[in-house]
Amino acid sequence: MADTVAVILAAGQGKRMHSRRPKVLHRIAGRCLVEHVLAAVGEAGIKKQIVVIGHGAEEVREALGPEYTYVLQEQQLGTGHALARAREAAGTAATVLVLCGDTPLLRPATLARLLKEHRDRQAAVTILTAVLDDPTGYGRIIRDGQGMVAGIVEERDANPVEKAIREINTGIYCFEAAYLWPFLEQLQPNNDQGEYYLTDVVGLACRENLPVQAVAAGDPEEILGVNDRAQLAKAGAILRRRINMGLMQAGVTIIDPETTYIDATVRIGPDTIIYPGTFLEGNTIIEEGCSLGPGTTLRDCQVGKGSHVIHTVALESEIGPGCQVGPFAYLRPGTVLDARVKVGDFVEIKASRIGAGSKVPHLTYLGDTTVGTGVNIGAGTITCNYDGEKKWPTVIEDGAFIGSNSNLVAPVRVGAGALVGAGSTITEDVPAGSMALARGRQVNLSGRSKKSSEKRQEKG
């Protein structure tokens, strides 16, 4: 759609959010509100997208990145004024699609249908409408005897007959640029707010008997705008149900969709089972046949085919195929588990790579560590990687065995096939095939226990 430009109005403050953050940057399902709108526009085939920014302009620009065109509305003087600011950036585009940055539930198919109807009917203006059971608060669509749009009546100006109309204006429009830009120059701020309203452009088109059409959204939930925290939560719940339903239809089992939170950016393969209380966030990718949860959070992670992750928090980590992780494991950024790795209960791993088939079953901290293949890490093993100023690496080569309750003081290397005796504190490299013991020798004092017991009894 090279001849079409989308303009997203995102300059408002959103006072009802009671937030220092611009309204359009509040997040649901892994994206801020305006990102959901931009994603829908892009998936509808519109490549050129202009974002009108105002309140928190630099914050919005930084959040969205350089791929969009930005225009600044320094004073927020209404939707008509905001769109007029985008005229130069729109260039020679023949059709202008206008959307609000706080409508995150719009579907790409709805926008594509709106554009198609606009072109097929050769309209000057096409309005996306919705039919609501309770239209209170919205402008009503007035149609003539031929079904053409004759105007928009705001709630405060509507008579009883007009208030009974259930078709409402969503604030999303297609305009032919040849009519739009001249009409914007004619707008006057003849209202209590002293603002320039985009709805007045529709009125100008109707007065000149230009073809003004309306296309109803199939699902009224799509047009929900977010103006406060309650509406933010409502939109998040709707989007969560939509995401979960799409995944289930694609072959993912979600035991309890109401307690499963999956961002719009997450990808999950078929035959994966997701248990209650699971959060999948960011750019997480789950391959087929996995089992996740309950009580699991994965953010920006990759999980290989057939892995099982239970009661675990993993951040910016890679879990290879056939792994078992948890319960109560913590994988911090930079963790990589190769195939068939076992990470058990109360294990924390940070910035480390664990080789194929290795086991870290319980009560262990591995930081800045490289573990080879077929290694067993005993319970209570700690890599002492931080000296108060710098973090140092630990290397445990293939086939090594680390006994329980061992401390590996970095920088240190345990060679292939080496064995570290339980309770050791290792401060020097262990050669391949060697056994290292670094603990005090046990001393048994005969009869000492009886004497100690008698003294305790005397003290009573």
Curated annotation (Swiss-Prot):
It comes from the Bacteria. It holds the Pfam family NTP_transf_3. Binds 1 Mg(2+) ion per subunit. SUPFAM superfamilies: Nucleotide-diphospho-sugar transferases, Trimeric LpxA-like enzymes. Its EC number is 2.7.7.23, 2.3.1.157. CDD domains: GT2_GlmU_N_bac (cd02540), LbH_GlmU_C (cd03353). It catalyses: alpha-D-glucosamine 1-phosphate + acetyl-CoA = N-acetyl-alpha-D-glucosamine 1-phosphate + CoA + H(+); N-acetyl-alpha-D-glucosamine 1-phosphate + UTP + H(+) = UDP-N-acetyl-alpha-D-glucosamine + diphosphate. This is Bifunctional protein GlmU. It comes from Moorella thermoacetica (strain ATCC 39073 / JCM 9320). The lineage of its organism: Bacteria, Bacillati, Bacillota, Clostridia, Moorellales. The gene is glmU.
